[in-house]
């Protein structure tokens, strides 16, 4: 249906209403009408408009009005609420004056359960008495009679109101222009006053005041005053709009709206003498902060730039974020540190068992710093296998010094920007993780843990390890520049601590670190850690009392041996937690059960099938079977090296998934034995007629390294001479072609494996004798350790009997090829 047809329909409906209700007159006696409370809206006499009803009480009032059979059929009292938030208003919640409205058209039910009505507002009315009838709010209503007057003052105000209203319509963007034509057709001064009041932007209470003003002269005066004020507001708004439009392009709509907001804000603040609180607050923070001179100058320029920007623009957001980052950093804001070295030592000893050398080195480091009041020096790097307490030790250092602790994981980082940030030209740019963690620390002197420093990766674009050089150099980190900040930030008060599992780092970075090695825990150390640290902590976490759960020392040893294989205690902690979970469940299910004790007998019941086996000494001496010692990421272990003799041409082949270094070690050992065969009791002719097959069991496991050289030599000599190898002897050491036994690593872990495997004698390189000082006494007391310098010396301990040397043997002549002969002639 077209708009013209709708207007004709509305006009016909209104005319029909006027004809059918000509007998209704304002000022007649009281009438009883249902009340329809209005929220945030005021209607005036003469309005013909839709209303939407949603509240249950209002719908009931409408239904009652439609059900009325008297001359008031379809009539209701529309009256505004004093508090629009009141959901079910009573009489006291409504104003006294409202309007009588007539339902002009059949109601339309809406999908949301509400109702749409077209009503004609007939006259003002006063509610004399409110009451409820059958759940519907009703009122005794007295229509208010309004009289027109030819008073000269009224006519003067009328003309002024019409003139000013026309100006408002031209300036306003919300009042339609068509209303001016409608105003010219109205003769009633009362209707003009009501129409103007309904059209301009006024508070609900002001419109209610106009509705309650019956005296026409007083009402037209009030409307004139309100219109004058509204006209002034619209004129100022127009001035602001014109001023804004002269500064920007007309096509930039978003920019226009932002500038209008800026101009309005400036107009208000200039008139009231106020300042923009947020920018002033930033200025105060810059002035009161301990920023460096360079940072203060830079951020002041950025703040000045921010004041001249559009608040909602993208560039303003970037600048604001930058200013916030600069202000939020701890510039020279230091925390109070613990200077009592004895107290620091107690904290370290209470937090970690064993590792006395490590704790002693840390205390020395702290003592020097306290005395010199300088933090320039070596950067500590805690090196050790997983689970030995590197990260927790760094946290304990923070506690021992009274500094805040922040941890930055470097594992997998492959972009330099992760360390030094992105430049602000990039979208979404942020500072690097160094600056981010300094903000998190809130102080300029935290303990800063660089975790897994050896796990950084690189690509063809950049290597983040080089970005760390500036951070970890005590001579440079006082002038660290993040790409995002673009100003120097002092990191010289930060105590950097790094952790690593290996030394696979660039030499320049490694040169800046002081390596402190944390070796694998011995079985005794694991036992002590479990008893004094892990069990109590896990009992608290699982809500178990000491009297409710316990584990015997023998069961704990078995748990360590058969259910874990690691250098540290992480898996041991998991296994203990598993035992406690099962205990908590059992105590909850069996009400009569008061406590559970885990012993060797019932350990399998709670922990399940044994997960690991470890190498053990052979029960008897065997030919070609040698016990070696290996070092892995999970600690030490025994490896069995087998050799058999086969008819052949004097060759050796090796199996067992050996790495390149270990294969070269096999070749070196074979060459040494071959070149010294007469010393070991067999001839070169015999040697050339046999092949040796060397095998290292557990073929699915990769093996590499040179430290099995002594064991390989022993197996080859044993199989060549037929002399058995002592099963209670294990050995480790690299072998040269001259039969020298050279230094190896992982001595502590290898000795722990030997003790665990029931070995009685361990041969080590003589050059490793100095490392025995760091071996626990319990280990040295459990096994006999013999340093050896040569293979011949080692064979005196490994073979069940010594071979009888032969006279100097002459190797058979081997015919030269034609090429070799020509080369020899040349």
Curated annotation (Swiss-Prot):
SUPFAM superfamilies (UniProt xref): P-loop containing nucleoside triphosphate hydrolases, PUA domain-like, Ribosomal protein S5 domain 2-like
Active site: 707, 750
InterPro entries named among the record's database cross-references: AAA+_ATPase, ATPase_AAA_core, Lon_bac, Lon_bac/euk-typ, Lon_lid, Lon_proteolytic, Lon_Prtase, Lon_prtase_N
Biological process per Gene Ontology, one example term: protein quality control for misfolded or incompletely synthesized proteins
Enzyme class: hydrolase
Bias-annotated ranges (Basic and acidic residues): 1-20
Keywords, sorted A to Z: ATP-binding, Cytoplasm, Hydrolase, Nucleotide-binding, Protease, Serine protease, Stress response
Localization per record: Cytoplasm
Sequence positions that bind ATP: 384-391
UniProt GO molecular function: ATP binding; ATP hydrolysis activity; ATP-dependent peptidase activity; sequence-specific DNA binding; serine-type endopeptidase activity
Pfam families: AAA, Lon_C, Lon_lid, LON_substr_bdg
Name of the molecule in the record: Lon protease
Species in which this protein is naturally found: Neorickettsia sennetsu (strain ATCC VR-367 / Miyayama)
Encoding gene, per UniProt annotation: lon
